[in-house]
């Protein structure tokens, strides 16, 4: 429960020292041995792809073509969209002076626009991000790209037709529809005003001091 702060508990910090979701524990890891915890979505997807033999080419050229787009998303689209959403949507609930948000909003929304162009250009010559096969590059990027119109403006899709085609195509995949249904079920309960205020305080005002105790407890039993 992200809104409830489960990611700051010592048990979770033992798995994910950066107190962020997602994280997994494989009790039957590649190569055997004890249970293997993995955090960061890109690392998780790469591991699962290797374990299952799916969504990641085995030849070096194909593999690294995919991985470069996985890392591109992790370093660019995800962080920039997170920051853009913070300044454009959540910041207004925190900042006393709206003018404090103007630079951050312009900076990060502009960067999301630029990154949309990067994807659109790549998808003009490829069915998927790393070529003509659906891979973990698409899996890790789509959840962010799907929300670009909502973040900026739905009319922006006219500027990125190849990106829109890709977003819609992946949205229709059975596994994606199934996953989205799970997410919708989890998010059905509406928070009270006090719960929403506490959630914002928890998620958007993080410091080392807030998680120091849990981190020290996790380190003792590591």
Locate predicted features.
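Short, solvent-exposed turn/loop segments enriched in Gly/Ser/Thr/Pro and often Arg
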Residues: 3, 136, 183-186
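Alpha-helix/helix-capping structural signal
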Residues: 43, 174-175
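GST-like fold's C-terminal all-alpha helical module
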Residues: 69-174, 220-222
């Amino acid at each position: 429960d992200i809104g409830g702060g489960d990611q700051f508990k010592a048990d979770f910090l033992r798995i994910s020292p950066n107190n962020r979701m997602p994280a997994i524990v494989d009790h039957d890891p590649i190569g055997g041995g004890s249970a293997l915890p993995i955090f960061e979505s890109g690392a998780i997807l790469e591991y699962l792809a290797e374990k299952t033999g799916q969504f990641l080419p085995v030849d070096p050229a194909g593999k690294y073509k995919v991985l470069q787009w996985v890392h591109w998303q992790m370093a660019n689209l995800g962080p920039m969209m997170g920051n853009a959403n913070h300044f454009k949507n959540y910041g207004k609930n925190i900042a006393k002076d709206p003018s404090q948000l103007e630079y951050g909003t312009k900076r990060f929304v502009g960067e999301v626009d630029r990154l949309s162009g990067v994807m659109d250009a790549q998808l003009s010559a490829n069915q998927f991000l790393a070529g003509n096969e659906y891979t973990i590059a698409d899996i890790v990027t789509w959840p962010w790209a799907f929300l670009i119109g909502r973040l900026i403006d739905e009319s922006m899709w006219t500027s990125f037709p190849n990106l829109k085609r890709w977003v819609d195509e992946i949205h229709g995949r059975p596994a994606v529809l199934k996953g989205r249904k799970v997410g919708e079920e989890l998010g059905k309960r509406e928070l009270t005003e006090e719960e929403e205020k506490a959630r914002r305080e928890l998620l958007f005002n993080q410091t080392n001091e807030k998680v120091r105790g849990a981190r020290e407890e996790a380190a003792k039993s590591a």
